[in-house]
C-alpha cells in the first residue's frame, strides 16, 4: 500500500535553548499533537538563560514532552515515518539532549533521522500561516531573535544564502539587556514592548547603528550602551539602587524599541529593493519578505514592516506570534528534507554557538 500525506507522520523535536518541545505533524501539514515545556521560572532569578540549568531541565522533560505529543496524536513510535531534530545552532547542552533523544528513538523504532537548522525552521513557520501561498519561496528572510539577527536569500525552504547578520548583539539580546537595566521581569523583551506601547518614542534620541550602511549586517551593542548611559550615566554599575520613574521607563523602552525597529525595517527594505530586479532578470526577482524568530512577535515591528510593504509594494509574511517563539511545529520543514532524501546518520553531532553565517 502506497503511503499518503494523511498516513505519513513526522515527530519533530526542539531543544535548542530553553524550550523543550515535540510535535507530530502529518505530511499535509496537519499538527496532530504538540507539547512545549518552558523554563521561564527556572531562569527568572538570573535575568537570562543559564545553559547548565537549561540542559538539566531538558533532560528531565524531553521524554514526557515527546510522550505527550504522541499521546495527543494517538500514534505510537512504530507509526511514524521519520524523526526530525534541530541540531544547530543553540546551546550545546540543550542541543545535545534533543539530538541524543532523536537518535535513540530513530534507532529503536528504525526510522530515518532528519537534522534541522533551527533558524531555517523559524522562517518556514511563515509557510504555515493560513492563507499563505502553497510555496512561499523565493523570499528574503529575516530572523530576529535573542541569539540571532540575520538576513537571507531563501531560494527554497532548505536552500538559503546568508546575506549578513549582527556583528555583536542580537536584537532580542538587546531587548533583554535593556529590560535588566530597568529591573523588568524575565523574559524582558515582552516587558519592554509593553512599556514601549505607553511611552514617548521620541523622548530619547538613541542611535540607529549601521542603518545607512549599504550591507546587510546589524549592530546593537552601541544602542544598548546608549540606553545604559541614558539611565545611569558613564561608569556606574549598580542599577538595582536606582529610583527610575515609571514614565522614564516607558519613554526609554519606547525610544529603544523605535531605534531597533527602524534599523530592522530599513535593512529589510534595502535587501528587497536590491533583489527585486537583480541583474534585470525577472526569473530571479524577489519581492517577498518572510520574518521569523522571537522578536518577530513584537507588534511595532510587525506594524512598521507592514507599512513598509504597503509603501514599497512587496509581499510580507510574518510567522504567527505563537510560532515566533521556539516550538516544534516549525519542524514541519523536515518534510522538505524528507522529499529531497536529505537524511542524517546516527553519528549526527550538534553544531552549537551563535556564529555568523547559520
Swiss-Prot record:
InterPro entries in the record: ATPase_NBD, Gcp-like_dom, KAE1/TsaD, Peptidase_M22_CS, TsaD
Top EC class of this enzyme: transferase
Cellular compartments annotated: Cytoplasm
EC number, UniProt record: 2.3.1.234
Keyword Cytoplasm: yes
Residue sites binding substrate per the record: 143-147, 176, 189, 298
CDD domains linked to this entry: ASKHA_NBD_TsaD_bac
Keyword terms: Acyltransferase, Cytoplasm, Iron, Metal-binding, Transferase, tRNA processing
GO biological process: tRNA threonylcarbamoyladenosine modification
Catalyzed reactions: L-threonylcarbamoyladenylate + adenosine(37) in tRNA = N(6)-L-threonylcarbamoyladenosine(37) in tRNA + AMP + H(+)
Cofactor(s) the protein requires to work: Fe(2+)
Coiled-coil residue spans: none
Binding site for Fe cation: 118, 122, 326
One GO CC term on file: cytoplasm
Co-factor binding details: Binds 1 Fe(2+) ion per subunit.
Function: Required for the formation of a threonylcarbamoyl group on adenosine at position 37 (t(6)A37) in tRNAs that read codons beginning with adenine. Is involved in the transfer of the threonylcarbamoyl moiety of threonylcarbamoyl-AMP (TC-AMP) to the N6 group of A37, together with TsaE and TsaB. TsaD likely plays a direct catalytic role in this reaction.
Family of this protein: Belongs to the KAE1 / TsaD family.
NCBIfam families named among the record's database cross-references: gcp_kae1, T6A_TsaD_YgjD
Protein name per UniProt: tRNA N6-adenosine threonylcarbamoyltransferase
